[in-house]
Structures are given as structure tokens and as C-alpha cells.
Curated annotation (Swiss-Prot):
Residues 496-511 have a biased composition (Polar residues). This is Homeodomain-interacting protein kinase 4. It is an enzyme of class 2 (transferase). The keyword Calcium does not apply. Transmembrane segments: none annotated. Residues 11-347 form the Protein kinase domain. It comes from Homo sapiens (Human). May act as a corepressor of transcription factors (Potential). GO terms for cellular component: cytoplasm; nucleus. The modification Phosphoserine is found at residue 511.
């Protein structure tokens, strides 16, 4: 067991939790407090010098946040020696991907997805107040704090790829964001803002429900193709402005086509790039609305006499899909902001409370909601939006909800649901219509689609039933998600964020709708009037570091220079008022810290699932 020492503390390394291209994460025992911590260890060389500056700069900007209320990881301290950098964080339990893996990727109930979504949206809203884009939101970077004591309480981690609005004027290709969660503006080369994180969260929500990534593209063409086949083509003005549009689209040869652009076919892409497109989706959705039909989600709507509990759960799932649709839009300015999303009926439970307050499902949802927000030693208090004082969520009126005591011990917080067998579609063309998202991808003319309008009429003439909600999505992928539970998810080639800045893309400024104070009476009015908090002024700095995710341990750099803390922008590490106590934040809530033991660190400490596992 090795030992490392900072100026103020000493750490015993218990075990290495994981290794990545950037370095490794170890579990350590902090002698001064007796608590277990996570230590991020990177080589001290010129390449990582700049990278570490970026992460430290972002952590410094976040030092005023309460990690418990903002749902971000607590940073303790930074130090270095002649060979390595060390960043010390609180130790958390496991990330959402590992939690899914432990539960055999069973679909997560909508009530638990809401609990996670609420907290991540709160984190994004707080980051936006500091003008910070996380830029790498995914299940691996959302950590469960303590699933036993605080079910589905989560924190956002890994700010190595984060950026500050005022400093990141350009983005380099390849890429920010992990591919499965990459926003359209990054894929197409359009101006972007903090709403790239909202897109990523929408993909995470869908993945928690599906048990499989919504858009698991093997490359950027597949990623764009999947989005087009589910959500339709982007509007022409977006493709006209996109500097990467020609990679995935071509001009439509049909003069009477509704869209002057069409998606390149798989054969076109193969001929141009020698890369064969792959099909990696589990569910081939023809619209985002079909998300609610997966994993038995539409059962309640099909029952002749559904009970109240089934109706409540179905209504909640439908509301969740409506929010996902607002988060997954081609155009970023049409995408819901974090603050407005916190007012959405799915997150606030407004609709569920008004129509299903007496159901057991509502009581379970409310209890899960509360426990995730409970900070030890504090009552759950509503978080207030900075711009207008409107609560993001309001629990005061439900404090006397009936039956909460009995609910506490009657049901587990995670109900492991095995996905029912999907009813395969016999004919993919049964429900084609002009409104179908996937229509027109390959440049069909308007006349080619007119006959599709006759499908309901033909069905009525022949006596066939036309389902109101559309068919279930086609089940496309049959094998296990991991092809063996002992295997870790490996990142496909080119899926990681890259820091070799080239092919610059201009960064858009703060979203126009976020510039005005919110005075709306409803969550929708609040969004249109600017529900997002205006970013605080951030000191301009001269350097912006590249992403931390793509550091290569084997990369050799000529004349490596050692890191000098005083060289950080703003010289905050050397300021007398920026001590360990000023950046460590409040003490971790939960189990009381253990004091130093005479015979070394205690055993049986909570395990920490590395937040640096590979990207999709």
C-alpha cells in the first residue's frame, strides 16, 4: 500500500479503481479525517499540464457552489510532485451505467428517471449560472451517492471536458461530447451553447427507460442517420448553415421535393469513406413518441378497464416522453432550457398530482423524490430560480401526504422489471404517413408519399384496425447489451472527446430566450419569457484547456515541462485566500467521517466506480 502526501494531508492508496487513457483513479484513505476519497492521478508532462489547468480552472469557478444542493461532486484538493498530478474528490458509490449493468439493464421506472432528471437539471441550471458547459454528460458521469441510504440521489462528475462560455469561442474537431450523447449542433458543425447538455440528458433519460442507448451510432454518419430516421430531417436553413452538412447530406435531385437536402444513403457513405454503416440500435423508432410503447409502456392504454395505478404510471411515462421530445430537438433555440425543464409537469409532478394524487404510484413517486433531495441534517427545501424566485419544485404542499409511513417499507425503490417480449412488426410500412418522421430521408418527392395518406382509408374499407397510437417500434438488435456481463462497455473507435483542436467551429452566445427575466405564470410561459438564469460574469482568461478525456498514457511529448501551479490562469492556486478549505466545499453528508485508525484504513468501505471509464 503506497502513500502520497500533500502539503496539508496524507493519503494511503487502497486500490486502483480504474484506468483510462488519461491516467487512473484510486481509492484512498485520508488520514486527517479517516474518510475514503477518490484520487484522480495523471502524469506530469507538458501535454497534461494544459489539460489539468482547464479542469482546475473549472473547479475553481465552481468553488462557490454547495455540492449537496447543486448535485455536483465535491472537490477536496489538488497537489503534485515531480512525476504526477493528484486531484482529490469525495468517494461516491457507482455510476448509472454500472447500476444499469447490475440490474441486467432492466428499464428504470419513470418515477426514478424523474428523480435523476430533477437533480441533473438542477446541476445544469447551477452550471449555467456560472456560464459553464459540462460537454460530456452521459450515464458514466452521473454518480449515485449512496443507493441504500439515499436512493437515486446523484451527482454530476468529471469536469475535464467542461468549458466556460466566454472563453470557448471555437470548438475543434474531432469532437466534444461522447458520440451517443452528442448534440446535432456538434455533429453538423453549428454554433452551440449550454443546451448541448440538455440534449445529452434527454438521451440519458431515454436510455434509462429503454435499457439501451437511444442513438448508439458507430460513427457520426450512423449517429446522424439514426436521428433522422426517428426525428426526420433537419430544416433546410440548418443544413445551409452547417459546415459539416456535406459529410452526411447531399442536394436533393428532385426539384419538387419538400426539402432541398437528402440524407446520403449507406451505399453513398461506404463509397466515399470505405466505412460500412452498422445497425446497433435495439429499437428502431419511427418517432420519439414510440418510446412510451417500449417495455410495456402502452399496456395501460390497451386495457379495457385499466386500474388507477396503471393509468397513473402510463400518464407519468407519457409526460416523460413529452419532456424528452422538448429536449431532443434539431435546433438548439427550440430546445428547452434547464430552468424551464425543471418546471415541466413531468419534473414538477404537477400533472401527476392533479390527476392521480390518491394513487399508490404517486405516493411512491413523491417519497423517492424527497429522499433523493434530502441532505442529512437539513429538511428538503425547494431550490429557487435565480431569476424570479419561482421554485423549481415544490414539496411543502405535499408534506402531509397520506400513507407515507406505510409506503416506506412496502416497496423497493428500484423495481427490477424484465422487458417483456417485443411484438415484432410484420410489415414496416403498415403505418407510414406524411407525418412520419423518417419520411423523405432519401429524397422522395411529394407525389411518392401521397398514397400513404390513403392507408387509414384503405384499412377502414377492408375492415382492418388502425391503431391510434401507432405501431410498436421494430426490435432490431437481439443480442445482450454487453455480450457477457463480465465485459465492460468499450468505446467504439472515434467516440471520445478529442482535444486536438482543428477545424474550428464558432460558438454561439447565450440563448436569446434566456436573456430576459422570467415572469410567466406557467412553466411554458416561463420558458418563453426566459426561464434560464442569466450567466454570471466570468473573469476572462487567456487559455482554454482541451478536453481531459482523450489523454493518452503512452503519448510521448518532447521536452516535457513540469507543472507550475502559479502558471494557472488567475494564479488562484497561489492566492493566499484560496486554500484547501476554500475549494473543498462543505463536508460530505451521510456517514460520519471515520477518524484515523492505528492499524491503517478501515475495511469494507463503500466502493467507487470510476468516473473515467471509456466513452461510448
Amino acid at each position: 500500500m503506497s502513500t502520497i502526501q500533500s502539503e496539508t494531508d496524507c493519503y494511503d492508496i487502497i486500490e486502483v479503481l480504474g484506468k483510462g487513457t488519461f491516467g487512473e483513479v484510486a481509492k484512498g484513505w485520508r488520514r486527517s479525517t479517516g474518510e475514503m476519497v477518490a484520487i484522480k492521478i495523471l502524469k506530469n508532462d507538458a501535454y497534461r499540464n494544459r489539460i489539468i489547468k482547464n479542469e482546475l480552472k473549472l473547479l475553481h469557478c465552481m468553488r462557490g457552489l454547495d455540492p449537496e444542493e447543486a448535485h455536483v461532486i465535491r472537490f477536496l484538493e489538488f497537489f503534485h510532485d515531480a512525476l504526477k498530478f493528484y486531484l482529490v474528490f469525495e468517494l461516491l458509490e457507482q455510476n448509472l451505467f454500472e447500476f444499469q449493468k447490475e440490474n441486467n439493464f432492466a428499464p428504470l421506472p419513470a418515477r426514478h428517471i424523474r428523480t435523476v432528471t430533477l437533480q441533473v437539471l438542477t446541476a445544469l441550471a447551477r452550471l449555467k449560472e456560472l456560464a459553464i458547459i459540462h460537454a460530456d454528460l452521459k450515464p458514466e458521469n452521473i454518480m449515485l451517492v449512496d443507493q441504500t441510504r439515499c436512493p437515486f440521489r446523484v451527482k454530476v462528475i468529471d469536469f475535464g471536458s467542461a468549458s466556460i462560455f466566454s472563453e470557448v469561442r471555437y470548438v475543434k474537431e474531432p469532437y466534444i461530447q461522447s458520440r451517443f450523447y452528442r448534440a446535432p449542433e456538434i455533429l453538423l458543425g453549428l454554433p452551440f451553447c449550454e443546451k448541448v447538455d440538455v440534449w445529452s440528458l434527454g438521451c440519458v433519460m431515454a436510455e434509462l427507460h429503454l435499457g439501451w442507448p437511444l442513438y448508439p451510432g458507430n460513427n457520426e454518419y450512423d449517429q446522424v442517420r439514426y436521428i433522422c430516421e426517428t426525428q426526420g430531417l433537419p430544416k433546410p436553413h440548418l443544413l445551409h448553415a452547417a459546415c459539416k452538412a456535406h459529410h452526411f447530406f447531399k442536394r436533393n435531385p428532385h426539384p419538387d421535393a419538400a426539402n432541398p437536402w437528402q440524407l446520403k444513403s449507406s451505399a453513398d457513405y461506404l463509397a466515399e469513406t470505405k466505412v460500412r454503416p452498422l445497425e446497433r440500435r435495439k429499437y428502431m423508432l419511427k418517432s420519439l413518441d414510440q418510446i412510451e410503447t417500449v417495455n410495456g409502456g402502452s399496456v395501460a392504454s390497451r386495457l379495457t378497464f385499466p386500474d388507477r395505478e396503471a393509468l397513473a404510471e402510463h400518464a407519468d411515462l407519457k409526460s416523460m416522453v413529452e419532456l424528452i421530445k422538448r429536449m431532443l430537438t434539431w435546433e438548439s433555440h427550440e430546445r428547452i432550457s434547464p430552468s424551464a425543464a425543471l418546471r415541466h409537469p413531468f419534473v414538477s409532478m404537477q400533472q401527476l398530482r392533479s390527476a392521480h394524487e390518491t394513487t399508490h404510484y404517486y405516493q411512491l413517486s413523491l417519497r423517492s423524490y424527497r429522499l433523493s433531495l434530502q441532505v442529512e441534517g437539513k429538511p428538503p427545501t425547494p431550490v429557487v430560480a435565480a431569476e424570479d424566485g419561482t421554485p423549481y419544485y415544490c414539496l411543502a404542499e405535499e408534506k402531509e401526504a397520506a400513507g407515507m409511513g406505510s409506503v416506506a417499507g412496502s416497496s423497493p425503490f428500484f423495481r427490477e422489471e424484465k422487458a417483456p417480449g417485443m411484438q415484432r412488426a410484420i410489415d414496416q410500412l403498415d403505418d407510414l404517413s406524411l407525418q412520419e418522421a423518417g419520411h423523405g430521408l432519401w429524397g422522395e418527392t411529394c407525389t411518392n408519399a401521397v398514397s400513404d395518406m390513403m392507408v387509414p382509408l384503405k384499412a377502414a374499407i377492408t375492415g382492418h384496425h388502425v391503431p391510434d397510437s401507432g405501431p410498436e417500434p421494430i426490435l432490431a438488435f437481439y443480442s445482450s447489451r454487453l455480450a457477457g456481463r463480465h465485459k465492460a462497455r468499450k468505446p467504439p473507435a472515434g467516440s471520445k472527446s478529442d482535444s486536438n483542436f482543428s477545424n474550428l467551429i464558432r460558438l454561439s452566445q447565450v440563448s436569446p430566450e434566456d436573456d430576459r427575466p422570467c415572469r410567466g405564470s406557467s412553466w411554458e410561459e416561463g420558458e418563453h419569457l426566459g426561464a434560464s438564469a442569466e450567466p454570471l460574469a466570468i473573469l476572462q482568461r487567456d487559455e482554454d484547456g482541451p478536453n481531459i478525456d482523450n489523454m493518452t498514457m503512452e503519448a510521448e511529448r518532447p521536452d516535457p515541462e513540469l507543472f507550475d501551479p502559479s502558471s494557472c490562469p488567475g494564479e488562484w492556486l497561489s492566492e493566499p485566500d484560496c486554500t484547501l478549505e476554500s475549494v473543498r466545499g462543505p463536508r460530505a453528508q451521510g456517514l460520519p467521517p471515520r477518524r484515523s485508525h492505528q492499524h491503517g484504513p478501515p475495511r469494507g468501505a463503500t466502493s467507487f466506480l470510476q468516473h473515467v471509464t471509456g466513452h461510448h
